[in-house]
Amino acid sequence: MPTIQQLVRKGREVLVEKSKSPALDSCPQRRGVCVRVYTTTPKKPNSAMRKVARVRLTNQKEVNSYIPGEGHNLQEHSIVLVRGGRVKDLPGVRYHIVRGTLDTAGVAGRTQRRSKYGAKRPKPGQAAPAKKK
């Protein structure tokens, strides 16, 4: 424990918080162009084919972004909106693509948590479409 005199001379060092999404440059979202759209496998013990896109942002930085939801319409040169948020079982993927904006379509047939997937509200009285396997 320092003495008061040591604190007068030196002071306390302020801890600097490191951003979890540095490529966004303190913006909530950024627009970008898909450079490559591909699938990758997660870390152990999980098993899947996760949909990922390499995106060049408007600030010229390139990031790996996760494409959430079932099915997507993205391909190379698609314009997307990128937000922060990592995917725990995909190393190096620290961003998410926002569904339902710009060239990214919302998830079709989504009835719950629709706002997170850019899905429109289904018409009242309309039967829910059969889920395909």
Curated annotation (Swiss-Prot):
As recorded in UniProt, coiled-coil segments are: none
Keyword tRNA-binding listed? The answer is yes
**Which controlled-vocabulary keywords does the entry list?**
Methylation, Ribonucleoprotein, Ribosomal protein, RNA-binding, rRNA-binding, tRNA-binding
One Pfam family, please name it: Ribosom_S12_S23
| A GO cellular-component term linked to this record | ribosome
Q: Which GO terms describe its molecular function?
A: rRNA binding; structural constituent of ribosome; tRNA binding
Where is composition skewed (Low complexity) in this entry?
Answer: 124-133
Q: Which SUPFAM superfamilies does the entry link to?
A: Nucleic acid-binding proteins
- 3-methylthioaspartic acid: residues bearing it: D89
- Which first-to-last residue range defines the signal peptide? none
Q: What are its GO biological-process terms?
A: translation
Q: Where is the composition biased (Basic residues)?
A: 111-123
Question: Which residue ranges does the record annotate as region Disordered?
Answer: 103-133
Q: Does the keyword Kinase apply?
A: no
User: How does this polypeptide assemble, per the annotation?
Assistant: Part of the 30S ribosomal subunit. Contacts proteins S8 and S17. May interact with IF1 in the 30S initiation complex.
Q: Which family does it belong to?
A: Belongs to the universal ribosomal protein uS12 family.
Q: What does it do?
A: With S4 and S5 plays an important role in translational accuracy. Interacts with and stabilizes bases of the 16S rRNA that are involved in tRNA selection in the A site and with the mRNA backbone. Located at the interface of the 30S and 50S subunits, it traverses the body of the 30S subunit contacting proteins on the other side and probably holding the rRNA structure together. The combined cluster of proteins S8, S12 and S17 appears to hold together the shoulder and platform of the 30S subunit.
Q: What is this protein called?
A: Small ribosomal subunit protein uS12
Q: Which organism does this sequence originate in?
A: Bacteroides thetaiotaomicron (strain ATCC 29148 / DSM 2079 / JCM 5827 / CCUG 10774 / NCTC 10582 / VPI-5482 / E50)
